[in-house]
Amino acid sequence: MFLLHEYDIFWAFLIISSVIPILVFLISGVLAPINEGPEKLSSYESGIEPMGNAWLQFRIRYYMFALVFVVFDVETVFLYPWAMSFDVLGVSVFIEALIFVLIPIVGSVYAWRKGALEWS
């Protein structure tokens, strides 16, 4: 028979972890001073008056390299637990991990062939 009281601790943690951030945002909104002025609209540069415009455009190439880095970084995070328990898992999990690694590699080769990773 399925008993709901087995999940009481889970629900308590879920409720507490949801209520605390909401309370923090509400309290900070109530206690924060509301001062609008030109100082709030300027960028802060270690106490020095800002020089030039704070809005800069970056080339799309930076975003492409950052995106490729994030994809492989997330892949590494997912593969680490698999590698730590490799001796316990079977061959089918190895094949699944191989497919998991091949999908971003195929995507990177495609982006490389299309010239998305060229720096020129």
Swiss-Prot record:
Keywords: Chloroplast, Membrane, NAD, NADP, Plastid, Plastoquinone, Quinone, Thylakoid, Translocase, Transmembrane, Transmembrane helix, Transport. Its EC number is 7.1.1.-. Signal peptide: none annotated. The chain crosses the membrane at residues 9-29, 64-84, 88-108. The keyword rRNA-binding does not apply. PANTHER family: NADH-UBIQUINONE OXIDOREDUCTASE CHAIN 3 (PTHR11058:SF9). NDH shuttles electrons from NAD(P)H:plastoquinone, via FMN and iron-sulfur (Fe-S) centers, to quinones in the photosynthetic chain and possibly in a chloroplast respiratory chain. The immediate electron acceptor for the enzyme in this species is believed to be plastoquinone. Couples the redox reaction to proton translocation, and thus conserves the redox energy in a proton gradient. This is NAD(P)H-quinone oxidoreductase subunit 3, chloroplastic. It comes from Chloranthus spicatus (Chulantree). The gene is ndhC.
